[in-house]
């Protein structure tokens, strides 16, 4: 029985199938953890959703920014981005069922030995705070009021966590930290603009969220996706798994038990 954690799939379904064959994934005994962004610019977002959903309890999914955007598009709140290939989802007979299933997924998934989220965990949070914050937004997403949240989540402010944040300010920060964060300023403020590799950043105050000196200690390693420019990052405390399959890079997965990394080059689409 093994736990496999995969980075951003973004509709790269064929690569996912090859990757699972490579590691001999068995849905009857193994668990696949998906670090968000199941859908978007790859050619088979619909097939990806159907497959992951079909795994039932053998799949543990967290929501990414592209997944939330898909929900916004389904509600008419946002337009499909030009490069997104998600239209088949809306045209399919099971599209609404898949979207409902997606909306039930968490922002943070936890194993006794690790946690998985899409972008990361705010450097101002300990794990207990991260759990509580994730649950606040998850309960809204699963409620009848989810449209209100999706309609109002698009904002880069506030960029600094305070325990007394409330209402939309609180929800926006939580969503941005879990699904959009890459860099932070030295004082802990989130930067929502820079997507470069850390080595190319000229702004001296910017640093990856996981390298902030004052980052709260977590008692489990964090596995995340979202940041393709890292080209994979492995340390004792964090493991970044997005290696840009949708950008002609590769799809990367790690087996937790022995830390073996599996990689599948992007196919020509």
UniProtKB/Swiss-Prot annotation:
Intrachain S-S bonds: none
Top-level taxon of origin: Bacteria
Reaction(s) the record says it catalyses: P(1),P(4)-bis(5'-adenosyl) tetraphosphate + H2O = 2 ADP + 2 H(+)
GO molecular function, one term: bis(5'-nucleosyl)-tetraphosphatase (symmetrical) activity
Hydrolase keyword on record: yes
Record EC number: 3.6.1.41
Family, similarity comment: Belongs to the Ap4A hydrolase family.
Biological function: Hydrolyzes diadenosine 5',5'''-P1,P4-tetraphosphate to yield ADP.
Name of the protein in its database record: Bis(5'-nucleosyl)-tetraphosphatase, symmetrical
Protein encoded by which gene: apaH
